């Protein structure tokens, strides 16, 4: 395929003057005509020669080309944290310098290695990334390359000409080596525009060709037939086969500075210029005199540079205006960006005179050349789970803003302003103190105690006219790090210093609050507003395959004296998080998690009632189950926290099966869900159903389902309060409840299907005689992993448990008891129909343990397989389970995926977290270890992984069983972090 394409392209160049000399001609009079046979022979011979020359060139070029495997390990400025591959090529074999793109080197922390053509691997560090132009340099140690002679490509920017045949040699589409052919079609196009809030090159010409390069080819050399690098592959069009190459003029200058150990000076007047053709310049006011002079001086040029964007408060602000046509600098006529760069870079700190034409008039202005490096951020702050840096020239240029302000490069943690917009925010003030720059921001954050709520004023770069004000929760316990990272171009590492330890939280004070009654003529219904509250959770660490996020819902206060609140487990999925209860939309109080039901989707949290001076009312809870057709009063909170109510009736009570997620995570199982006839309940993520006397009959809860198209599917259903009464009563008595369950999934089948499966007629008659709600049999839909020999099987039809006919799902919901009863398990006698025969089984119940320990290694979160994993798998490997991996971590770079089980490290079995920690703590920094794993489908495989403890230290979070608090401990870290 490649050869055919190259042949076609080469045939277009067979008419060059060099080839004409080799052709044979037959003369007819004064006319010179080429015979058909000679034409074919000449083209064929030229094609062979051209092909052989390219083959010889490519064989040398590939020895200089490297595949770059890298990670930009933290979000910084406009660059996200990511893991990717690209291309580079050696430009100095003695110093070990590799040229690639700036968007590969990145503006922030970089970790990577390169692979040479002979598959030798070598670590690289970044030594330079240009503030504007899309190039950067990596450095490797040439002494570590032992099995091949390092070949460097010579840079020849002057050889990039229109019509030149070129090859792009690189790591196209992630392949080890691809060779793409093309012809240079333009050498004077403006820099491509990649969109807002991302890196863009500007103030330079770009070279255009059609080579159809794709992802992974960034940083590839563009070579001519003589093997010289004439340009640098930088980007391409998504809608055509067009590629964009960066000229090498300024790259060559930067390389010479590095080779001479001299600083690479970069000057700026904070103005963006665009190359515009003469016809457009004339419309902007270019006079015929200047046009004729420029055309005479620069016959190959098609236009002049025109001012596009002038940054406020920059050196040219108020002097140069948009639409000004650049005529000369210091009296030197200008036609290219290269001339501008050369003058500015040589005059940092000096005054330079610019001659521009505005409306047909020549205007001379003097600007002091600024230092481009000084307005390019080289440090960032990490605090409260978010990262910040000074607003950069890159970001400010797009919106013509002054280069100042605190730029939120990762909207997460306490500063997660908008789940949909993660980049582009400017923090104007925190806790009523202005934050004009990063240093001021750091000083403000030093003074704020942990778990405080402070006011933040901020705005988005794309909307300067709409300031935002919100209150945020300061998290310095889950996200305890407060660090300043600074770039070190000598080592390639971003060194960090710890700024300040967390300030202890301030003691809470009690507050008063007033409840607004529910609009109702029934006083018993109206006062139920005093029994409802808001609940929100802040999860900073993703565990149990659940995201780190903030969730909000409502809850029912089931005991005002002790502060118990029942809430959907959708909002309280586990206990590695912070919980808050808001009373009367006025008082926010921290709460503790007292109970998580393993199947029925509810949690119970507890707040300190001494902090609430408000008439909170404990509601009456029903002692009887709801039935189909019953009337009820629905009271619920809408998504915007408005309390609404309406009369309704129960339309159905049936077993439901919530779809499982692709990656197993908590979901409700074995439910008898209540459906109601109401047009307002779909608008409420929490509510209650009551009798007319205010007795609570059921809860209206949100249930987490599967993830579809990157969105969470949430189901809304009712849960009878009777399903919660035993747990509530145990908590009210001052004890801790425990639930023992038969760990299997159940569903329902009709009498017809039960008969087909072999259920005897006598049992069908019993069901018809005793069932009052729905004629159904309960069947086993799936069986969780267990090491017990006696167990249910999928397809079993449940007849009875302990000699009692099973007619409804709640009979299989588990056994609830107080924790002080010390019951390891119960044995239940099941009678089932299996394969058409009645079978008696003595089944042990199990207690579902919540996650109480996690290990963070190489950027992935490891834990014991949680309950959802055991529900989904029939055979669980002996290893630690990966539940999450960081977006720029070694785990992603080397191939650890969520749902993988790590069974061995360096051939040592790791059956549990303690053994895993024992093994990995012996692995030195920046070394490879062998990891054997098992996929979710029990397919074994192995990888090698290189540790990086500077950016990804090993840590453990473990729950103290006595206090209920999570304790963090870091291991083998390159720097100690005070706790």
UniProtKB/Swiss-Prot annotation:
InterPro entries: PDZ (IPR001478), PDZ-like_dom (IPR025926), PDZ_6 (IPR041489), PDZ_sf (IPR036034), Peptidase_S1_PA (IPR009003), Peptidase_S1C (IPR001940). Residues 273-361, 750-836 form the PDZ domain. It comes from the Eukaryota. Keywords: Apoptosis, Hydrolase, Nucleus, Protease, Repeat, Serine protease. It is an enzyme of class 3 (hydrolase). It is found in: Nucleus. Residues 1-20 are annotated as: Disordered. Coiled coil: none annotated. The active site is at 103 (charge relay system), 134 (charge relay system), 217 (charge relay system). GO terms for biological process: apoptotic process; cellular response to heat; lipid metabolic process; stress-induced homeostatically regulated protein degradation pathway. Pfam families: PDZ_1, PDZ_6, Trypsin_2. The keyword Ribonucleoprotein does not apply. CDD domains: cpPDZ1_ScNma111-like, cpPDZ3_ScNma111-like, PDZ2-4_Nma111p-like. GO terms for cellular component: nucleus. Residues 65-255 are annotated as: Serine protease. GO terms for molecular function: serine-type endopeptidase activity. Its EC number is 3.4.21.-. Belongs to the peptidase S1C family. Nuclear serine protease which mediates apoptosis. This is Pro-apoptotic serine protease NMA111.
């Amino acid at each position: 395929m490649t050869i055919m394409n190259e042949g076609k392209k080469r045939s277009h160049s067979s008419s060059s003057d060099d080839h004409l000399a080799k052709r044979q001609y037959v003369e007819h009079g004064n006319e010179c005509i080429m015979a058909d046979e000679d034409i074919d022979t000449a083209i064929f011979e030229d094609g062979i020669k051209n092909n052989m020359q390219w083959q010889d060139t490519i064989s040398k070029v590939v020895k200089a080309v490297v595949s770059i495997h890298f990670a930009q390990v933290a979000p910084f400025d406009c660059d996200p944290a990511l893991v990717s591959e690209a291309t580079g090529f050696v430009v100095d074999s003695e110093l070990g310098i590799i040229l690639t793109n700036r968007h590969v080197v990145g503006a922030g922390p970089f970790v990577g290695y390169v692979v040479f053509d002979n598959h030798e691997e070598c670590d690289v560090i970044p030594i330079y990334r240009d503030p504007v132009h899309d190039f950067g340099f990596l450095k490797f140690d040439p002494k570590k390359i032992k099995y091949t002679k390092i070949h460097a490509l010579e840079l020849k920017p002057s050889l990039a000409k229109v019509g030149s045949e070129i090859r792009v040699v690189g790591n196209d589409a992630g392949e080890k080596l691809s060779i793409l052919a093309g012809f240079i079609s333009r050498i004077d196009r403006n820099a491509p525009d990649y969109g807002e809030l991302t890196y863009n090159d500007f103030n330079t010409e770009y070279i255009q060709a059609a080579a159809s390069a794709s992802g992974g080819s960034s940083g590839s050399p563009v070579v001519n037939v003589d093997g010289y690098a004439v340009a640098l592959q930088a980007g391409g069009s998504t809608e055509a086969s067009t590629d964009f190459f960066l000229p090498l003029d300024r790259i060559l200058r930067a390389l010479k500075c590095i080779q001479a150990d001299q600083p690479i000076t970069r000057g700026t007047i904070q103005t963006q210029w665009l190359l515009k053709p003469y016809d457009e310049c004339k419309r902007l006011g270019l006079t015929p005199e200047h046009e004729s002079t420029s055309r005479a001086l620069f016959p190959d040029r098609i236009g002049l540079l025109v001012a596009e964007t002038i940054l406020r408060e920059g050196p040219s602000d108020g002097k140069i205006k948009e639409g000004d046509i650049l005529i000369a600098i210091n009296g030197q006529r200008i036609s290219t960006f290269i001339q501008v760069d050369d003058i500015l870079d040589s005059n940092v700190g000096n005054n330079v005179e610019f001659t521009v034409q505005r409306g047909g008039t020549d205007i001379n202005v003097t600007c002091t050349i600024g230092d481009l490096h000084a307005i390019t951020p080289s440090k960032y702050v990490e605090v409260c789970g978010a990262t910040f840096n000074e607003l950069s020239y890159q970001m400010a240029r797009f919106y013509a803003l002054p280069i100042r302000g605190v730029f939120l490069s990762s909207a997460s943690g306490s500063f997660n302003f908008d789940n949909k917009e993660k980049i582009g925010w400017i923090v104007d003030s925190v806790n009523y103190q202005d934050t004009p720059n990063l240093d001021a921001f750091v000083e403000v954050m030093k003074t704020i105690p942990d778990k405080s709520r402070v006011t933040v004023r901020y705005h988005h770069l794309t909307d300067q006219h709409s300031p935002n004000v919100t209150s945020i929760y300061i998290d310095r316990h889950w996200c305890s790090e407060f660090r300043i990272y600074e770039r070190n171009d000598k080592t390639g590492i971003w060194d960090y210093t710890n700024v300040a330890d967390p300030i202890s939280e301030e003691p809470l004070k009690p507050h008063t609050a007033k409840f607004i009654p529910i609009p109702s003529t029934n006083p018993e219904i109206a006062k139920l507003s005093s029994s409802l509250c808001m609940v929100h959770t802040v999860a900073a660490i993703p565990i149990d395959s659940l995201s780190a996020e903030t969730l909000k819902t409502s809850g029912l206060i089931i005991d005002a004296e002790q502060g118990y609140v029942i809430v959907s487990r959708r909002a309280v999925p586990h206990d590695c998080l912070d919980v808050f209860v808001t009373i009367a939309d006025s008082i926010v109080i921290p709460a503790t998690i007292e109970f998580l039901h393993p199947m029925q989707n509810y949690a119970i949290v507890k707040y300190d009632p001494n902090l609430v001076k408000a008439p909170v009312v404990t509601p009456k809870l029903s002692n009887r189950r709801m039935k189909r057709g019953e009337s009820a009063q629905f009271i619920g909170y809408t998504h915007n926290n408005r309390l609404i109510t309406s009369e309704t009736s129960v339309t159905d009570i049936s077993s439901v099966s919530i779809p499982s997620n692709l990656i197993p995570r908590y979901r409700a199982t074995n439910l008898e869900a209540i459906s109601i006839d109401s047009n307002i309940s779909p608008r409420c993520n929490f509510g209650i159903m009551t009798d007319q006397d205010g007795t609570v009959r059921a809860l209206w809860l949100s249930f987490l389902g599967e993830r579809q198209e990157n969105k969470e599917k949430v189901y809304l259903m009712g849960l009878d309060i009777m399903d919660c009464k035993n747990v509530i009563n145990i908590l009210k008595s001052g004890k801790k409840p425990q639930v023992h369950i038969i760990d299997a999934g159940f569903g329902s089948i009709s009498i017809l299907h039960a008969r087909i499966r072999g259920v005897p007629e006598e049992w069908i008659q019993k069901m018809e005689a005793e069932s009052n709600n729905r004629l159904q049999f309960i069947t086993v839909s799936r069986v969780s992993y267990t090491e017990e020999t006696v167990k249910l099987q999928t397809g079993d039809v449940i007849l009875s448990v302990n000699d009692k006919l099973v007619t409804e799902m709640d009979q299989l919901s588990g056994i609830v008891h107080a924790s002080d009863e010390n019951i390891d398990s119960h044995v239940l006698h099941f009678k089932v129909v299996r394969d058409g025969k009645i079978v008696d089984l003595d089944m042990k119940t199990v207690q579902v343990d919540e996650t109480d320990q996690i290990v963070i290694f190489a950027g992935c979160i490891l834990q014991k397989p949680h309950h959802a994993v055991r529900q989904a798998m029939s055979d669980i490997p002996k290893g630690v389970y990966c539940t999450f991996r960081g977006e720029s971590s070694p785990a992603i770079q080397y191939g650890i995926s969520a749902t993988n089980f790590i069974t061995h490290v360096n051939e040592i079995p790791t059956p549990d977290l303690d053994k895993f920690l024992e093994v990995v703590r012996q692995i030195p920094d920046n070394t490879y270890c062998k990891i054997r794993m098992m996929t979710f489908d029990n397919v074994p495989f192995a990888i090698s992984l290189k540790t990086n403890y500077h950016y990804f230290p090993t840590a453990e979070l473990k729950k103290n069983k006595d206090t209920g608090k999570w304790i963090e401990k870091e291991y083998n870290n390159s720097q100690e972090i005070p706790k």
